[in-house]
UniProtKB/Swiss-Prot annotation:
Quaternary data: Monomer.
Taxonomic superkingdom: Bacteria
Active site per the UniProt annotation: H19
Cellular compartment(s): Cytoplasm
Keywords (A to Z) from UniProt: Cytoplasm, Hydrolase, RNA-binding, tRNA-binding
A GO-annotated cellular component: cytoplasm
Name of this protein: Peptidyl-tRNA hydrolase
Organismal lineage: Bacteria, Pseudomonadati, Pseudomonadota, Alphaproteobacteria, Hyphomicrobiales
Reactions that this protein is recorded to catalyse: an N-acyl-L-alpha-aminoacyl-tRNA + H2O = an N-acyl-L-amino acid + a tRNA + H(+)
Length: 239
C-alpha cells in the first residue's frame, strides 16, 4: 500500500493558492485514475483506488498546512506503514514555476508542512516538489505563496498536473527518473539525461620526460675509426 498526500490549506479561500498545488495534484490523480469519491478520515479528505495493482490512498490533510504531519502520522500508524510507503506532493519556492523534482529524505527547506511531517512520520519518505517560483524578495514570499496562480500560470500548471496524473503509475512504482522525464517533456522542458562519465586525461609530462620516453637508442657504428676503437676496447661483436 502507498499513501500519496498532497499538501495545502482547506477551504475555498485557499483553493487557488500556490501553496495548494499539492491538493491540486492529488485531485488530478483522483480524477484521472478513477478513484473513489472524497470522504473524511484521518483529519483529511481521502480517496482510495488502485494504480498498477498497488492499493493507493490519496490524502488532503484538513489540519491546515502547519499540522499536516498529524493527519499523515495517523494514517501511517493505522495501516502500519513505514516512511518509504509515503509520497508527499507540495510547493517549492526554490524551483522555477512548472519544474518538478523528486527525492527521498532531506531537509524541510523552511516548509512548515514538511517540518510537521518530519516530526510525525520521520524523514525518509519520497517528496515530489513542484516549483512555484520565487518572488525575488523575501518580504514578498508570504503573499506569493498564499496568492492565487495568475492567469498566465494556467497553461504550465495544467500541463504539469496532467503529466503527474497521466504518469501516476511511475510514481507508484518508484520510477522517479522516468517520471521526471515525462513531466519535463509534457511541460516543454528537456528530458533529464545521465551525465556522461568524464574520461580521465593523462597527466601532462615535462618535455624532458617526453623526450626520454620517445628517444630511440642510437646504433653503434660498424665501420670507421670509432668502430675500430670500440673493437679494441670490447672485442669484436658476436664473440
Amino acid at each position: 500500500m502507498l499513501i500519496i498526500a498532497g499538501l495545502g490549506n482547506p477551504g475555498p479561500k485557499y483553493a487557488g493558492n500556490r501553496h495548494n498545488i499539492g491538493f491540486m495534484a492529488v485531485d488530478a490523480i483522483q480524477r484521472r485514475q478513477g478513484f473513489s469519491a472524497w470522504s473524511r478520515k484521518f483529519k483529511s479528505e481521502v480517496s482510495e483506488g488502485e494504480i498498477d495493482g498497488e492499493r493507493v490512498l490519496l490524502m488532503k490533510p484538513q489540519t491546515f498546512m502547519n499540522l499536516s504531519g498529524e493527519a499523515l502520522g495517523d494514517a501511517m500508524r493505522f495501516y502500519k506503514l513505514a516512511p518509504k510507503d509515503i509520497v508527499v506532493i507540495y510547493d517549492e519556492l526554490d524551483l522555477p514555476a512548472g519544474k518538478a523534482r523528486i527525492k527521498t529524505g532531506g531537509g524541510h527547506g523552511g516548509h512548515n508542512g514538511i517540518k510537521s511531517i518530519d516530526a510525525h512520520c520521520g524523514k525518509e519518505y519520497r517528496r515530489l516538489r513542484l516549483g512555484i517560483g520565487h518572488p525575488g524578495v523575501k518580504d514578498l514570499v508570504h503573499a506569493h505563496v498564499l496568492g492565487d496562480f495568475a492567469k498566465a500560470d494556467q497553461a504550465w500548471l495544467s500541463l504539469l498536473l496532467e503529466a503527474i496524473a497521466d504518469n501516476a503509475a511511475m510514481l507508484v512504482k518508484g520510477e522517479d527518473s522516468q517520471l521526471m522525464n515525462k513531466i519535463a517533456l509534457a511541460t516543454g522542458g528537456k528530458p533529464e539525461t545521465e551525465k556522461p562519465v568524464a574520461v580521465k586525461k593523462q597527466a601532462a609530462q615535462s618535455h624532458i620526460h617526453q623526450a626520454r620516453a620517445t628517444a630511440q637508442p642510437k646504433k653503434l657504428p660498424v665501420t670507421g675509426p670509432m668502430a675500430d676503437m670500440l673493437k679494441k676496447m670490447f672485442g669484436p661483436k658476436g664473440d
